């Protein structure tokens, strides 16, 4: 009698079959390759980018239709100031920029969702438990940064400049420059609020531990002051102080969260 294995490889299912008769014993192994071709990954990525582009474009168009309401919202943090335009098309260009950034902002959750759906099939359960909460937390922290900037940093900076020039000159501000000022403060604060996410990533990759982060608190105070000065478009000390305090609170919150994750 002959008894020897015969191996056959296929790409549909994984199984192991035994075929037996009176004379021969055959061992048939079938393997599977479930990975999609690279071209299909690229095609899926193109579709998700295309959908994201159209969502942002639609939200931008809706924002442009309601741009007067958005302008009034942006003007709320400051009182007793008259805005003007330096050129005939300045206000129009400003409203287009406001509409685009608003559409991009409200389209960000959809974009994050598309990224998650694209990455999800290729992630392990362990990676999914780490990456998904970090992406959602990053989006939430960015939103908190915008809220903190709108209700705390922007009024503090604008009131400082108004009080400094009070009874000396009449405040007449270019709306385009005012919008650029707010935009820089918005996004710099939103980026500063990503500090805990960076800390958690560094800790999970074992690049630096939570104890080492905590031990460097003296240097962090200095660094937070420098970052606050760099990210703040104004030169007033109050705005820089508020942003520096926020950075410190975020840093120590990141250390605490990393301690909880590791332990």
Curated annotation (Swiss-Prot):
GO terms for biological process: intracellular protein transmembrane transport; protein transport by the Tat complex. It is a multi-pass membrane protein. PROSITE patterns: TATC. GO terms for molecular function: proton motive force dependent protein transmembrane transporter activity. Pfam families: TatC (PF00902). Keywords: Chloroplast, Membrane, Plastid, Transmembrane, Transmembrane helix. The chain crosses the membrane at residues 53-73, 103-123, 130-150, 153-173, 181-201, 213-233, 241-261. InterPro entries: Sec-indep_translocase_CS, TatC. Disulfide bonds: none annotated. It is found in: Plastid, Chloroplast membrane. It comes from the Eukaryota. Its main location: plastid. GO terms for cellular component: chloroplast membrane; TAT protein transport complex. Belongs to the TatC family. This is Uncharacterized tatC-like protein ycf43. The lineage of its organism: Eukaryota, Sar, Stramenopiles, Ochrophyta, Bacillariophyta.
